[in-house]
């Protein structure tokens, strides 16, 4: 990119994005209220495998004259369930998405009887389990994204030191062939989402996915890439969660570089 002489630019030296303001895991009944973040070298809130989350009055705004608040996503929720409410919050000038809600796909490698070997598709998914015994997993054709079958998980473990490869055990032998490359999704462990009465601007996107009901209402979005992107990312980040019910109402959309709303099956 070309920059004009005297133009202020931001240089991000925290590519690993490991300095999050809040990191939440395997927790329930969480409330984060009345927080202001002026500068952070990572994400604002990361929550994975959590249940029933309320974020009320979270403000990520840089000090006057500063170009950046957070160097990554402000909100990032992975395979959470129950309810997720984000309201009365002001977000601006983040270097990545204002909000990203998704699950994680695993990729099938092989299967034998009641067991299957799988791996995570991205190194940043390591050292975490995104399903629990008793969860019903969907197996998805990677070419058509059609659901091929289901299996109930009975056990899960890592098989390597990098914690990227997994052994999955099922309650019963799947009644369909598990092919190498199939995507494995945990669709039920996703939240019902409410994003209400927020002011978000100068950010790339809001990314929403998941089978739970999602309501986006009475927000002000402007000066962004795309205000609402509603689809999973099966082809790149391996982020799962095809939308089932999305309601967008009574919002104000200002200038968006791509579009105000983009919805689809997968991106």
Regions found by a protein language model. Give the residues of each.
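Small/polar beta-strand repeat architecture
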Residues: 1-18, 149-150, 156-193, 197, ...
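Short glycine/acidic-rich loop motifs that flank beta-strands on beta-rich extracellular proteins
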Residues: 19-20, 41-46, 63-73, 95-101, ...
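Ser/Thr/Gly-rich low-complexity blocks that favor extended beta-strand/coil architectures
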Residues: 126-161
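Extracellular beta-strand-rich solenoid/capping regions of secreted or surface-exposed proteins
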Residues: 15-28, 42-50, 74-80, 186-189, ...
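Catalytic cores of secreted or luminal carbohydrate-active enzymes
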Residues: 82, 90, 94-106
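Long amphipathic alpha-helical scaffold regions
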Residues: 50-84, 111-126, 220-256
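Short "repeat-start/strand-capping" segments in structured domains, especially the N-termini
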Residues: 27-31, 49-54, 80-85, 191-194, ...
């Amino acid at each position: 990119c070309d920059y004009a002489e005297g133009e202020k630019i931001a240089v991000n030296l925290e590519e690993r994005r490991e300095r999050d303001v809040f990191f939440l895991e395997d927790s329930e009944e969480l409330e984060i209220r009345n927080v202001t973040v002026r500068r952070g070298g990572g994400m604002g809130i990361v929550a994975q495998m959590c249940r029933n989350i309320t974020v009320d009055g979270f403000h990520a705004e840089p000090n006057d004259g500063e170009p950046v608040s957070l160097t990554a996503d402000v909100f990032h929720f992975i395979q959470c369930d129950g309810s997720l409410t984000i309201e009365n919050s002001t977000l601006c000038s983040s270097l990545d998405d204002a909000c990203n809600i998704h699950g994680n796909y695993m990729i099938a490698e092989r299967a034998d009887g009641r067991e299957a070997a799988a791996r995570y598709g991205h190194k940043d998914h390591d050292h975490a389990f995104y399903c629990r015994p008793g969860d019903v997993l969907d197996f998805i054709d990677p070419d058509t994204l059609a659901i091929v079958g289901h299996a109930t998980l009975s056990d899960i473990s890592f098989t390597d030191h990098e914690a990227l490869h997994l052994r999955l055990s099922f309650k019963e032998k799947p009644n369909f062939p598990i092919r190498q490359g199939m995507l494995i999704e945990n669709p039920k462990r996703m939240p019902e989402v409410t994003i209400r009465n927020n002011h978000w601007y100068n950010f790339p996107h809001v990314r929403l996915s998941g089978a739970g009901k999602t309501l986006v209402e009475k927000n002000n979005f402007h000066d962004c890439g795309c205000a609402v992107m509603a689809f999973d990312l099966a082809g790149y980040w391996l982020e799962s969660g095809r939308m089932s019910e999305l309601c967008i109402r009574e919002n104000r959309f200002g200038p968006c570089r791509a579009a105000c709303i983009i919805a689809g099956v997968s991106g």
